[in-house]
UniProtKB/Swiss-Prot annotation:
Protein family (similarity comment): Belongs to the bacterial ribosomal protein bL12 family.
A Pfam family of this chain: Ribosomal_L12_N
Keyword Transferase on entry: no
Alphabetized UniProt keyword annotations: Ribonucleoprotein, Ribosomal protein
Source organism of this protein record: Thioalkalivibrio sulfidiphilus (strain HL-EbGR7)
HAMAP family assigned: Ribosomal_bL12
Protein name from the UniProt record: Large ribosomal subunit protein bL12
Subunit and partners: Homodimer. Part of the ribosomal stalk of the 50S ribosomal subunit. Forms a multimeric L10(L12)X complex, where L10 forms an elongated spine to which 2 to 4 L12 dimers bind in a sequential fashion. Binds GTP-bound translation factors.
Function as written in the Swiss-Prot or TrEMBL entry: Forms part of the ribosomal stalk which helps the ribosome interact with GTP-bound translation factors. Is thus essential for accurate translation.
Domain of life of the organism encoding this protein: Bacteria
Keyword Aminoacyl-tRNA synthetase: no
GO molecular function: mRNA binding; structural constituent of ribosome
Alphabetical GO biological process terms: translation
Length: 125
């Protein structure tokens, strides 16, 4: 009779931390692997993700400050997002805040231009 993954996980969940450390050491010895090697590989994977992020199709429009024309910026936020007056006011006063997530480049540039014309400071991320 084979031992199922569920049985193994149940057994491990009932172990103490010291028992788990001993188990990991025994597995490293038995299979000739090192848990440290897997951890060291993780930053390499993250660095590869950053290279892929350079060619972006989607942008987040982030308002960093509303400038001197708070009322005008609130009006633009309401028009862009469809939020109510209170929600738009809270978004503007809570700057920096994300106005739009996952916008394509043209849409993000348009939103940025509208907000900057109203007096806000905007970043595309």
């Amino acid at each position: 009779m084979a031992v199922s993954k569920e049985d193994i996980l149940e057994t491990i969940s009932n172990m103490t931390v010291l028992e788990i450390v001993d188990l990991i050491s025994a597995m490293e010895e038995k299979f000739g692997v090192s848990a440290a090697a897997a951890v060291a590989a993780a930053p390499v994977a993250a660095a590869g993700g950053e290279a892929a992020a350079e060619v972006k199709d989607e942008f987040d429009v982030v308002m960093t400050s509303f400038g001197a024309n708070k009322v005008g910026v609130i009006k633009v936020i309401r028009a862009i997002t469809g939020l109510g007056l209170k929600e738009a006011k809270d978004m503007v006063e809570g700057a920096p805040s994300t106005v739009k997530e996952g916008a394509n480049k043209d849409e993000a540039e348009k939103i940025k231009k509208e907000l900057e014309e109203a007096g806000a400071s905007v970043e595309l991320k």
